[in-house]
Amino acid sequence: MPQYLVRLAQAHESFRKVELQALADIAGVPLHFVKYEEDSPYCIVDLPSEAAARKAIARSILAQGIYELWGQGSTYDALHDSVRSLTTSWWPQYITASFRFTIEGYRGSRSNDEQRDIIDSFSYMAFKGPPRMRNPDVAFRVFEDYDLNVKKPKYIYFGRFIADSCRNEAKKTFDLKKRHYISTTSMDAELTLLTANIAHVAPGKLFYDPFMGTGGFPIACAHFGAVVFGSDIDGRTIRGLGGSARRGQTGKYDVVGNFKQYDLESSYLGAFVSDLTNTPLRIPPPSKDHTTGYLDGIVCDPPYGIREGLKVLGSQQALLDVERQSHQDQFKEPGYIPPKRPYSFTALLDDILAFAVATLVPDGRISMWMPTANDEDIELIIPSHPCLELTSVCVQAFNKWSRRLLTYRRRREEEVPEGAAEAVRREYEKGTRASELNDFRRKYFQGFKEFESMKKEFIRMKVDARAVEEMASGGETPGAGATDSVVKDDDTKT
């Protein structure tokens, strides 16, 4: 099987391999990773043909392009030996074609004279066509992979250009700076497009976002051909009554306007006000004979409860029958604001998975984001369900915390152990403070104090060790006041 070099973007490294595999699955082409390293933008894969390579790379967000691999080696002598042994029979078909040679270095560079010498070293290929820097018939590129602060490359690749991805065009088109309607919680456009790829969004599929906000995820899914709809507990966000988060922007902006901006209105079914625990969507009853799901996929970024405690629709206090009767038709009155109660973020994640199990078709995907503190055992808090297979976990790290994109596949009925689905039981927490229900929210506002206290203790240990060394060498022992001063200064610097 031919080998190809994928030129990756050196960003969101834990997402890159997952996205490539998802795109190959969508295109229906077998893909095998021959060489992949997170600290390098060069990846070697096996693909059946050039046409398969074009399909696999076409809508990638984290790959820049794909090249037919003509040779590789740790030195230029090894590279040329590899090119001769692998591609000699390929040269005649390009003998009269116009061509272009370029050189790219990762963490290193070459002067113009050095680049010219490297290009001349391939003269044994004896191409007779004219060199052309713009729109050549065939383009070749040398890739040099350097270690940091090292002048010689550690590895070199040589390849023939096959195709670019849509990365640059998509990022430019969906840039949030150019979007008419955004909010303070709108997710970066690159990540929404990436989530759509990993969730196997494809033309003709039906996708739903239960926390749509200003419509970032539905827009990304619609861009790749899906039919989309969404919901949110705050109807003002959907209708645009709260205004835009962009300074100086006036006028009426809403989710529909965003779809019109990208000419995607025909793919948008609409939106409604709801939370996932009280959804008006049909929840099919479990059936052993057939699967009754109707969604091809779910993409969402659930609220973490940081800016305000996580809430769902419902009263915090139990209502008497008389009170419930009097409130029954109040939602029809103008200006009605539905009551809300605090809710557990962990319980919400379980609700999302239970909803996915009930509504996804077999092999349907759900991709959702969730936060976690870096100093916790992350695997323990990843939710699970016997009817869902966790296919990938991708991490986006921040300063003191991180969030993960979890992707699940809806298992077919024959894949689910008998009785496993019925054994899933959930406990609902009511009437508690939002911080008690949401461990991540509490840690966020405490500034991850456990981490800070560990850092201060480490600084004190360093100071004590310094004092012991001075005593051993006959120096003056610093007093308690000096130790406190050093610790305070170190804290200030950190």
Q: How should these model regions be labeled?
A:
Residues M1-R54, I61, R107, M133-D137, ...:
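Class I S-adenosyl-L-methionine-dependent methyltransferase catalytic core
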